[in-house]
Structures are given as C-alpha cells and as structure tokens.
Amino acid sequence: MVTQVPSSTNILVIGGGPAGAYAAGVLVREGFEVTLLEKDFFPRYHIGESMLPSWRQFLRFIDMEEKMKNYGFLPKPGGAIKLNQDKREGYTDFIANNPENSAWNVVRSEFDQLLLNHVAEQGVKVYEGTRVDEIHFSPEEPTRPVSLTWSKDDKTRGDISFNWLVDASGRNGLMSTKYLKNRTFNRSLKNVAVWGYWTGTNRYAPGTNRENAPWFEALTDETGWVWFIPLHDGTTNVGVVLVEEDSKRKKAEYRAKHEGKSLAEVQYDRYMEDIQLAPGLIGLLGDGKFDGKLQAAGDYSYHASGYAGPHFRIAGDAGAFIDPFFSSGIHLAFTGGLSAACTIAASIRGHCTEEEASEFHSSKIKTAFTRFLFVVLGIYKQLRAQQSQILYEADEESLDRAILSLRPVIQGAADADADLTKEELENTLDFCKSVLEDEPQANGNGAAKQDAVPAPIPVALSSGAGPEKDAKRREIEAESLRSLQEMDDCKRNFGTEVINGFFVKMEQGVLGLVRA
C-alpha cells in the first residue's frame, strides 16, 4: 500500500469495505485514476460472513473469482430455514442445477483484505488508517463535493481535491447522515443482534450435498431468530436477532430476578437462554464450546431518499441496510459499487448528463433495496406468528414452496437462470404482495399474533382506492419487478435492464450507460 496521500485525484472513494473496494476496482480497470481512503488498518473484524451466489458474477467481472475459489473459504451450497417447529425446514439449494453455483461462508477480515489487496494490485491507490474529517463543497454548486480533509493517528492531516466521490463509509454514511441528512429508519425492522463463536459444533446435513449450509431458525417464543454459520477456520458463528422491544423486555425481566449481575453477565445469560428457544440449533451445537466472547449491534434497518447527486454516489451500508436475514448486505454493496462505477464512467464519457447518471444510480439502489425488503418483511411476519398461514398453507410440510417462489431474490444470481421469464418474475412479486397484504390466518394450532407482527404493508401496496394511490401502487410494482429481474445475472441484467431510459454497457474499457 502507498503511504503519502496525494493532494488531488480524479475519483475518490471513502471506505475500503466491499462497496468501496468494488467500485474502486471497477473504475480503475476502466483506466481512471482512483484513490481510496480507509479509516482502519486491514485486516479488521467485521460481521456478515454468509454470501449469496450472485457474488460470483460480481467477482468474475473484476477477475477475482478464481482467487476466491482457491483461497480456502468454506463452500456454501445453500441455506436451511426453519420458521415453525411443526414443519420441516425449508432449503434454498444453490447447486441443484449447477455444482459451480455455490457461494462461500467467509471470515470477513480475510475476505475484505483479499478484495482490497486485489483492487490495489489493479492500480487503486489505497491509504489505510486515514479518517475523513470533513467534506467540502463547491461555492458555485453547493451540493457538489469537491474536496475533503483527512487525518491519521500520528496527527498528520491534509486535504485532497477530487472530481468524483464515492461514499462507501459504512453505517456512518458521511454524505447521507452529516450533509444530506436524508436517512430514514424503518420502524418495522428495529432489531438487535448478539453473537459469538463456537468450536467443535456439528454440521447441518453431514455427508450430503447440503453439508456446511448455514442454519436459520425462528425462536419458539416468536421474538426473533438465530443463525448458525460454519467457517473455514473451524469456528461457527452463532447469533441471536431479537426485535428491539422484546430484547429490552427480556433484559428487564431478567434483571428484576437477578439483581446485582453486571451488564456483561446479563447479556451472556440472555444469549444462552435465547438459543435454548431454537431446538434445531441446539442439536447443531452438540458438544461445541463457546469461546466466551459476545458481540452486539443494533440491526436497525434504514434507507435514504436518494443515493446520488452532482459528482457523488453513495453505495453499500453508507446508504441503506435491511437486515442480516438472507445475507443481502454484500450483494447490495456490490450492486451499489458497480452502479456507482457505471454511472460515473457514463458521465465522464458523455454517455448522458450527470443528472441522468445520478438518477439512474439512485433508482438502481432503490429497486435493489425494495427487492430484499419485501422478502424480509414476509419472513418476519411469519416468524412473529408461527402458527399462522403466511408463507405456507396448512397442509404443507415445509417452506419449500415459499422458497421456490422467492428463488430469484434469496439466491441472488444463482438458480435464477438466464431464461427466467417475465411470468416467473411476476409470480414472485405476486407472492411477496400476498404475504404483506393478507391478514395472518390461524391454522388450528394457535391464534395469529397480529398485534405482534412488526411488518406493516408498504404504503404503496396497502389496500385502498383512488387514482393517486393506484398510480403509486403501479409505480412500486413496476419498480419491484425490475428489481427481481436484476437478480438473474449481474452482467446480463446490468446490460439489459432499462432504468429511466438507460441500460448499462457491461463491457470493460467502455463501461457506461446506453440510451434505450
């Protein structure tokens, strides 16, 4: 890595995580000068270890797929999902039609460093341990960033000017939170996660083509869910996600019964009690040993009203975050990184106006966010009312039908082959809509907990009449259908999907936008 931050650059990227590194890598391969500032020194710890098969498509575009295949990360053949103890778990099979369609479970510190090193080798100037303190805007064009002030732990400071900015600063979201102030939290998905690492655990479906698949299971008290993700270093990440209100209530009740315990002791005891509410997980833990260290984070879902403006783009968690369910984070980071790179290249090369390019990027991020939001809301609606008929009918034994219906979303670019039809995409959207619109129906084993369901229907899909509401409904439906199409194949859909009258020219050396 280089050490002296220059005083100017053509394209500046804030953040060396997946969104920033990917955008930088795509842009430098187009022949542009790219500088990247990262506040941490890699490797650094990060949560988010389960991948989608769509990653292969993105990594292939920057010639990194073979590095991933040869590194030694644990192959991920699919994922198991259990939302009702009376029914068999559902399974999303990544490799049913193609053994090469598997994803990976990764140690993020290693994967993120592998990606950052790869783009540095491609020509990106990377500066680690470099914080961004302030972004400066043009006096003539107040919404256009033109330079920033950086600093390091050794007290050195400086300024760097640029023509283009990609904000991939993670959840801090500098542009969105500090300057645009356009971030909105989704009250339906205010959750908290607590996780730790275990050794000596069992594996899901050992000896079959499902071995090493992660396990996701709803808690029997309907307050949240757990994850079980095996890793190549011999550890397994076991996490608990609770609705924030339920987490607070459980902690308060526990403290009332166990006065004098420290916060760390309460957190540990609550974690151990919550995982007991996932019988399938207990079987997978077997005789495994917990390493004794817990970590926690607020999994608050949020989005922004826009993700671009004059000469800047926002990508990854800097703009939006949904939920850890379905491992959408890095897929959305890569989508945002590629869109940022495509639209910057298009603007530089005169394929369109800068306003048209920035609007394309914002629309791309919004549709990607909408896709996963619909599915995650449906999952939470079911796990909060487990005896209700939401994702499955009363006589169904598992989630398999629902998973098949949602295949274009939850597998990323995997099983959704290049022949995916408009009818199949519409069926997926219709399924999502029906889940969000229908009232939960008790199936005889219990009453629906409608008051506990935290997933309201998106306003544009709720029932009601009137020309304005009907028009908004059609707009969201069309946007969502486009977002489902983009799950097919990142190169194929980026090169064919029309957004705001443009589609992407997915060809290295001439990357940009083409008017439809």
From Swiss-Prot:
Its EC number is 1.14.19.-. GO terms for biological process: secondary metabolite biosynthetic process. This is Flavin-dependent halogenase armH2. Belongs to the flavin-dependent halogenase family. Melleolide sesquiterpene aryl esters are cytotoxic secondary products with anti-cancer potential. Armillaridin shows therapeutic and radiosensitizing effects on human esophageal cancer cells. Armillaridin induces autophagy-associated cell death in human chronic myelogenous leukemia as well as of hepatocellular carcinoma cells. Armillaridin can also inhibit the differentiation and activation of human macrophages and thus might have potential to be developed as a biological response modifier for inflammatory diseases. Flavin-dependent halogenase involved in the biosynthesis of melleolides, a range of antifungal and phytotoxic polyketide derivatives composed of an orsellinic acid (OA) moiety esterified to various sesquiterpene alcohols. The halogenase catalyzes the transfer of a single chlorine atom to the melleolide backbone, resulting in a 6'-chloromelleolide product. The enzyme acts on free substrate and does not depend on carrier-protein-dependent acceptor molecules. It comes from the Eukaryota. It is an enzyme of class 1 (oxidoreductase). FAD binds at G16, A19, E49, I330. The gene is armH2. InterPro entries: FAD/NAD-bd_sf, Flavin-dep_Halogenase_NPB, Flavin_halogenase.
